[in-house]
């Protein structure tokens, strides 16, 4: 992705981390593996954070574009 992705990279990475975390958490529960469950929860938190960063970058870009139009 380019430097002009306006948060898309973070959103994609965030979604991947959230899905990966969900899978780890479910597998951890099924196998009674507390460590894997914790890793899954952590991955979901990281994914949410990355997604938020992506959203902020997108909003900043939109704001800058709006200011250019004026």
UniProtKB/Swiss-Prot annotation:
Stretches of the chain forming a coiled coil according to its record: none
Homology family: Belongs to the UPF0337 (CsbD) family.
PANTHER family, alphabetized: UPF0337 PROTEIN YJBJ
Any matching Pfam family: CsbD
Source organism of the structure: Bacillus cereus (strain ATCC 14579 / DSM 31 / CCUG 7414 / JCM 2152 / NBRC 15305 / NCIMB 9373 / NCTC 2599 / NRRL B-3711)
UniProt-recorded name of the protein: UPF0337 protein BC_3635
